[in-house]
Amino acid sequence: MRTATLYRYSVPMEAGVILRHQRLKSRDGLLVKLQQGELSGWGEIAPLPEFSQETLDQAQVAAECWLQHWVSGVESDDSVLPSVAFGLSCAQAELKQTLPLSADYRKASLCTGDPDELFAVLQALPGEKVAKVKVGLYEAVRDGMIVNVLLEALPDLTLRLDANRSWSRAKADGFAKYVNPALRSRIAFLEEPCKTRAESREFAQDTGIAIAWDESVREADFQVEAEPGVAAIVIKPTLVGSLARCQQLVQQAHQAGLVAVISSSIESSLGLTQLARLAAWLTPATVPGLDTLDLMQAQVVRPWPDSPLPLITTEQLGVVWHR
């Protein structure tokens, strides 16, 4: 016999979490639990405002429709809504025990704040020093100067930078001007520096700063291929779709000689632990981009190892659908 439950969560965010144009005050999403006999599987459905194509309400409607079929014994195709496809595929994989349990809890530290604070945090990082810095929120020249200072001060540091298509080509060049050419190879990649792919490609070739595709990966005309100056693709499953789609993208990236990075869309601790398992399975040689839990004030159902944040249990969540 099959049963399914859909829970809704809302976790307050730390102050100062800004998406593209708005402050994110709470992270809201759905957790799905599939039960078949003694086996169960969980997944998270959490569209990210300003980044996902679907809203949470739309995702809930689609999830309920899929679950209604599933409990009736009908196997439906993946949802066309990426967050729904990802969450339901995780729940099915756990149910079928096809999502490996081993997890990669390493994370590229997400760095915000002034350079002095960043330096202290980065200096204290154990092991491989890989950090992610958001650029494009302030002046490009300022970003370039900060990146240069960090790379100069910490010779074993590798940076991943994310501009979210913030810059014109001129501003991107302004950034590069302040990064010493001798240090640029320690920028693992800069995600989507310019507003168009063509400008980003030109920027990479002209400056020697490697780029990665992020937003582009979710666009209909995108193809994974080796290109001069392109080092990686960033895969955010909540925005991309099912586990099968993620696996396909990773395989295509590796075949093209590109790095594939499994990355967070600010999921709850439950979703993050599943992303850590996905990373250990599909991209074991690459540190995943999962350092977003500390943006929240609580964990949900499953804890991240060693996190001091309080845990919201299943009993504390609201049930929005059950059959």
Swiss-Prot record:
Keywords: Lyase, Magnesium, Menaquinone biosynthesis, Metal-binding. SUPFAM superfamilies: Enolase C-terminal domain-like, Enolase N-terminal domain-like. CDD domains: OSBS (cd03320). Its cofactor is a divalent metal cation. It comes from the Bacteria. GO terms for biological process: menaquinone biosynthetic process. Mg(2+) binds at residues 162, 191, 214. Signal peptide: none annotated. The active site is at residues 134, 236. PANTHER family: O-SUCCINYLBENZOATE SYNTHASE (PTHR48073:SF2), O-SUCCINYLBENZOATE SYNTHASE-RELATED (PTHR48073). Belongs to the mandelate racemase/muconate lactonizing enzyme family. MenC type 1 subfamily. Converts 2-succinyl-6-hydroxy-2,4-cyclohexadiene-1-carboxylate (SHCHC) to 2-succinylbenzoate (OSB). This is o-succinylbenzoate synthase. It comes from Yersinia pseudotuberculosis serotype I (strain IP32953). The gene is menC.
